[in-house]
């Protein structure tokens, strides 16, 4: 489902609603030795460096119909990356844009050690969090993306693209609408589009791969969806190892440990 411009509400003045999408994905991997765990973290760090994350966020900006004003990005030592993009709902004349904004020009970005993106009213940010523990054979990787917009632009239109951009075993999505605008008669509007569930904006083929749970507070315009991958294809969770090198009994044990890790992350509770 897309939030289109058809059947537009007739508003008085500017649309003052703020729509914020918080999107977290978790990728889980089996890495038995400390060497494998460190290699996995290094691999993830390279796969999702600030340059690739910048490209993803620029695509998101285009999908929601916004325009890049400024980009800031940074890779961290020993691992992790961050990107922030400031966006505007409509194209602005060059003379209207603050001189500190780089408009996402790559040649400018190459001359800076740190890059941040800005919108006139809105922003898009991403941070990565690789993680492992030497006493645990499982390593994880979290991507935290926030898209906040004002006006007619809604970030939920980019959900399918975001899910497809990462290897997602667990997904948590929060969407909220704040503020109010007015119609032409002066009546307050606390939301300007219909929504009953975040799942309404996720492709059916994607939903079939996950168990999904909603927790919504409609009177507060708060929507929350959690998703857990249904099937574990073990080969996809092994780092630099072939599944056939592992004995069947150990395969089952690894699958059980992966599933337990996913369930705890999904529930936000130490269960096992």
From Swiss-Prot:
Q: In which pathway does it act?
A: Amine and polyamine biosynthesis; S-adenosylmethioninamine biosynthesis; S-adenosylmethioninamine from S-adenosyl-L-methionine: step 1/1
Q: Which GO terms describe its biological process?
A: spermidine biosynthetic process
**Any binding details for the cofactor?**
Binds 1 pyruvoyl group covalently per subunit.
- Major enzyme class: lyase
In terms of superkingdom, the source organism counts as Bacteria
The reaction(s) annotated as catalysed by this protein in its Swiss-Prot or TrEMBL entry are: S-adenosyl-L-methionine + H(+) = S-adenosyl 3-(methylsulfanyl)propylamine + CO2
Q: Which Gene3D superfamilies match?
A: S-adenosylmethionine decarboxylase (3.60.90.10)
Q: What family is it from?
A: Belongs to the prokaryotic AdoMetDC family. Type 2 subfamily.
Record-linked PANTHER family: S-ADENOSYLMETHIONINE DECARBOXYLASE PROENZYME
Quaternary context: Heterooctamer of four alpha and four beta chains arranged as a tetramer of alpha/beta heterodimers.
Name assigned to this protein: S-adenosylmethionine decarboxylase proenzyme
């Amino acid at each position: 489902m897309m939030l289109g411009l058809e059947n537009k509400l007739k508003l008085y003045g500017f649309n003052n609603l703020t729509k914020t999408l918080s999107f977290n994905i978790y990728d889980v991997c089996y890495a038995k030795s400390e060497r494998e765990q460190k290699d996995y973290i290094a691999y993830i760090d390279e796969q999702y460096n600030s340059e690739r994350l910048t490209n993803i966020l620029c695509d998101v900006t285009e999908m929601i119909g916004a325009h890049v004003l400024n980009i800031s990005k940074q890779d961290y030592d020993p691992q992790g990356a961050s990107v922030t993009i400031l966006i505007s709902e409509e194209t602005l004349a060059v003379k209207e844009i603050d001189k500190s904004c780089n408009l996402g020009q790559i040649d400018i970005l190459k001359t800076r050690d740190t890059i941040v993106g800005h919108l006139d009213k809105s922003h898009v940010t991403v941070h990565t969090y690789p993680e492992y523990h030497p006493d645990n054979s499982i390593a994880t990787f979290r991507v935290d993306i926030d898209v906040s917009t004002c006006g007619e632009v809604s970030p939920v239109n980019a959900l399918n693209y975001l899910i497809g951009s990462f290897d997602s075993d667990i997904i948590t999505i929060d969407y909220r609408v704040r503020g109010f605008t007015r119609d032409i008669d002066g009546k307050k509007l606390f939301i300007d589009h219909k929504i009953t569930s975040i799942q309404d904006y996720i492709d059916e083929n994607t939903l079939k791969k996950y168990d999904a749970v909603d927790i919504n507070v409609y009177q507060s315009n708060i929507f929350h969806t959690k998703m857990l991958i249904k099937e574990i294809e073990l080969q996809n969770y092994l780092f630099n190892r072939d599944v056939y090198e592992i004995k069947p009994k150990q395969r089952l044990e690894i699958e059980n440990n992966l599933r337990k890790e996913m369930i705890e992350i999904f529930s936000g509770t130490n269960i096992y």
